[in-house]
Amino acid sequence: MARRSSFQSCQIISLFTFAVGVNICLGFTAHRIKRAEGWEEGPPTVLSDSPWTNISGSCKGRCFELQEAGPPDCRCDNLCKSYTSCCHDFDELCLKTARGWECTKDRCGEVRNEENACHCSEDCLARGDCCTNYQVVCKGESHWVDDDCEEIKAAECPAGFVRPPLIIFSVDGFRASYMKKGSKVMPNIEKLRSCGTHSPYMRPVYPTKTFPNLYTLATGLYPESHGIVGNSMYDPVFDATFHLRGREKFNHRWWGGQPLWITATKQGVKAGTFFWSVVIPHERRILTILQWLTLPDHERPSVYAFYSEQPDFSGHKYGPFGPEMTNPLREIDKIVGQLMDGLKQLKLHRCVNVIFVGDHGMEDVTCDRTEFLSNYLTNVDDITLVPGTLGRIRSKFSNNAKYDPKAIIANLTCKKPDQHFKPYLKQHLPKRLHYANNRRIEDIHLLVERRWHVARKPLDVYKKPSGKCFFQGDHGFDNKVNSMQTVFVGYGSTFKYKTKVPPFENIELYNVMCDLLGLKPAPNNGTHGSLNHLLRTNTFRPTMPEEVTRPNYPGIMYLQSDFDLGCTCDDKVEPKNKLDELNKRLHTKGSTEERHLLYGRPAVLYRTRYDILYHTDFESGYSEIFLMPLWTSYTVSKQAEVSSVPDHLTSCVRPDVRVSPSFSQNCLAYKNDKQMSYGFLFPPYLSSSPEAKYDAFLVTNMVPMYPAFKRVWNYFQRVLVKKYASERNGVNVISGPIFDYDYDGLHDTEDKIKQYVEGSSIPVPTHYYSIITSCLDFTQPADKCDGPLSVSSFILPHRPDNEESCNSSEDESKWVEELMKMHTARVRDIEHLTSLDFFRKTSRSYPEILTLKTYLHTYESEI
């Protein structure tokens, strides 16, 4: 994974809006890109800030040409309407609708009429312009949807096709639960799903808005990486605002990363139109794609995309549960049927790969459920709020010395018992959101409760003159919320037959699309190979990363007298010779590794120094640089008991004679800092014997912790670990510190950490992680699992207060587990934040392990 900052100003492409009041939708044509001055590499700018309007010339023979005509010539491509640059006869020649989009019995064998939208004449097959149902109505063939499922074991393409073409059929606002309507409403989509490869849902990126997610699908990047952090945004360096109704969105400087069509063209693979002007009917878009598929070999693109503004438009208007949603879904399905019938008519239905995919879901939302910041703040006129299903706050006035994000956060935190949003400084947002490392993301962020909106004040809520709300649905919420999930279906010769796969995140699709086209992906946030199980054959075979630093295995026994920790309790060990026995135990490897490192030793992927420390109940990789473990691993059986801690061990720490005193923490640092305490990575409560309990109080098991965070950590170790072990027939737990002071989602180097903890020998982690693994089949114990694994991971923010949980004054049982669920994470997120590599020694294939690493336990109900 490349550092996100590298994507901020590299390869670019414009993406265009389709919002109400703007006469365009997302669009790109393969040869549209022209090199801009001042850029060293990559596809430079598309379009200037001002449209040109020369309309001289004609579209005769040029409708939907793949190459954009440059000034002073007029244009006939799919986006000329958006830039008022079409030839004068574009509508007349290219947007024909006469006699509709289908053949009827009375049209079969008709005399060709060039005014018709599509043809039913005897020569239409040869000319590639038949209506998509021509062979069904006029030749007695069956509709594609009426044919039985067939397993396409190899692509059956006409001569001249170098690779199976890829068609991406993207639908806006398609909530995953819409698929439950089944074949009665969507027979064509249901057939794609049942005959091909599908997931119960696909997770969008946050925010669950259209622009960020469509561009993520195209690039494999998080919004903080590609720069499109919302449908509207302000860039403080540009001092400019990007929004749906303005022309600034046409400026190339907003768009980072390398989208699929540029990846294709840079590697010699032709790409067709990805986006369409909204005035072009869906049927015309399908017919155009089908006509492009009949082009000569040297002109024919290998990748195409169709985009539908539905069902998003209707979902906003009627809400996701409105009975009015049935017709828009039927219309989308009808278009899918036209595509598949058209492919069958061209004998390409066993050749082409089709991806049917959404950008986000839809939730039931109305004006009546709106939180107003004026009920919390007295100065709402001094702030700018990006409102709606999430809130982003900045000062209305630049260089406002009185603007204090922390003070605003304090005034918005836990002020009402029925508060429907939670304020965060962006660096404190759950790491799984990947929504902090971009200057366009404001310092203050409001996570809004599902089904609610946030606005500055009542006057900011737009209603109809009648006073009624003009919308019943919206999206943008936390991307783990089930209503925000969307659809994924893959169908064709390269996808598996009748296969259901686990849910995944849309950052992974870019790599899959590259694999389908035989392309090498540009750097992206996906994990290449994690979706290999979708495909019949895999062109990319991932390999495990090489270990950079191998550990030391301490052999020297330091003298007890060498240590002055300032908190030792060894003088309380009775009898005195027992101390020697306890220390000798520390050099006994025994079966520790087999018992506590069930999936192999984590690899360190950067240069450092660390030691492997064995104990009866756990194993650690101890950092000589950070003076704490990088990881600690232990296995807890279903039968494990939670025991109490003896009084004489509650406030002391033992020296570890295997580690030099100079590489050991000192308790005096904690005694001198009343704001800091310490905790343990292996929980003393789970020690298997009184002797083993002494190992848990070794200084090498100690980590710095704020007293407030210790409440979270102790409850997790004392109660939740045992709970999970009981529920899952045993678990393996790996925990450790995270350092992400610059909140870029990547491991901080030693030099970077020193910048933030100057003057301290013990760096304070920004987060702590925990990876909890068991057998997916709970009838098998964790340490004897021979089937698929199940994993739950957490990245817990290490903060000096628990104000994120408004009921943190209550018993931990009332709030800690909910806090942890909010900060659920993928193993892959933890790997990026620690530069560690987990699960290196298992009987599972490496792609299967990558699938496990990219899984997110959402703790949401079923879709």
Curated annotation (Swiss-Prot):
Changing residue 210 to A: Loss of lysophospholipase activity and ability to hydrolyze sphingosylphosphorylcholine. 1-(9Z-octadecenoyl)-sn-glycero-3-phosphate binds at residues 210, 231, 312, 475. Inhibited by lysophosphatidic acid (LPA) and sphingosine-1-phosphate (S1P). Inhibited by EDTA and EGTA. Optimum pH is 9.0 (isoform 1), 8.0 (isoform 3). Isoform 1 is less sensitive to pH. Isoform 1, isoform 2 and isoform 3 all retain some activity at pH 9.5. GO terms for molecular function: alkylglycerophosphoethanolamine phosphodiesterase activity; calcium ion binding; hydrolase activity; lysophospholipase activity; nucleic acid binding; phosphodiesterase I activity; phospholipase D activity; polysaccharide binding. Ca(2+) binds at residues 740, 742, 744, 746, 748. Zn(2+) 1 binds at residues 172, 210, 359-360. Residues 1-27 form the signal peptide. Its EC number is 3.1.4.39, 3.1.4.4. It holds the Pfam family Somatomedin_B. InterPro entries: Alkaline_phosphatase_core_sf (IPR017850), DNA/RNA_non-sp_Endonuclease_sf (IPR044929), Endo_G_ENPP1-like_dom (IPR001604), ENPP1-3/EXOG-like_nuc-like (IPR020821), His-Me_finger_sf (IPR044925), Phosphodiest/P_Trfase (IPR002591), SMB_chordata (IPR020436), Somatomedin_B-like_dom_sf (IPR036024). SMART domains: Endonuclease_NS, NUC, SO. Residues 830-851 are annotated as: Required for secretion. The active site is at 210 (nucleophile). Binds 2 Zn(2+) ions per subunit. SUPFAM superfamilies: Alkaline phosphatase-like, His-Me finger endonucleases, Somatomedin B domain. It is found in: Secreted. Gene3D superfamilies: 4.10.410.20, Alkaline Phosphatase, subunit A, Extracellular Endonuclease, subunit A. Residues 55-98, 99-143 form the SMB domain. 1-hexadecanoyl-sn-glycero-3-phosphate binds at residues 210, 231, 312, 475. Residues 598-863 are annotated as: Nuclease-like domain. Isoform 1 and isoform 3 are active from 45 to 60 degrees Celsius. This is Autotaxin. The gene is ENPP2.
